[in-house]
């Protein structure tokens, strides 16, 4: 069995609510084992068959979530190796991260961005909002909180494509708890 992390976009925001027990039941219904929910914010960990096609898992889970919850939920899947690699990334100098009043954010992308998408996205960076791209992740270091940033999520997404955002701290905690 291989272990995966699935990050759900827009769950438990406004009327798009899902209880942890419902998410676990959904994972089991679509055939995944050892399901767990990390916090109530759409972070799922589960085991799937080692031979399973990683490319097909998000659609399988999205279909199950739609049937179970009654609304569409985009899924951003990462393997154990990918989670460990993301948690180990240091896209900005340690002194920059320490000096920032904002938390380092990780945007999990649907796929690796094209060169043109990278260029458009990185052009949005400012002195107050630093951006870096590594693989299928965008790292954002806001000088203050993301809500106070001049750089909006919509602008980033328009440049790079669909994504869901987590703090680096959340990714590190998931890596330590489920993938160590």
Model-derived features: positions:
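Surface-exposed, charge/polar-rich loops and edge strands
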Residues: 2-41, 45-180
């Amino acid at each position: 069995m291989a272990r995966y992390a699935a990050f759900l976009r827009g769950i438990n925001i406004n009327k798009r609510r899902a209880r942890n027990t419902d998410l676990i039941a959904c994972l089991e219904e679509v055939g995944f084992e050892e399901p767990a929910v990390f916090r109530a914010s759409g972070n799922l960990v589960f085991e799937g068959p080692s031979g399973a096609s990683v490319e097909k898992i998000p659609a399988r889970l999205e279909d199950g979530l739609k049937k179970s919850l009654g609304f569409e939920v985009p899924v951003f899947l990462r393997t154990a190796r990918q989670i460990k690699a993301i948690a180990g990334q240091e896209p900005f100098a340690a002194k920059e991260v320490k000096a920032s009043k904002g938390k380092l954010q990780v945007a999990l992308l649907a796929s690796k961005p094209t060169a043109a998408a990278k260029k458009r996205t990185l052009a949005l960076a400012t002195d107050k909002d630093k951006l870096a791209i590594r693989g299928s992740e965008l790292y954002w270091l806001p000088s203050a909180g993301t809500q106070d940033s001049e750089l909006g999520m919509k602008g980033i997404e328009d440049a790079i494509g669909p994504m869901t955002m987590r703090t680096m701290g959340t990714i590190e905690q998931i890596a330590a708890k489920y993938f160590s």
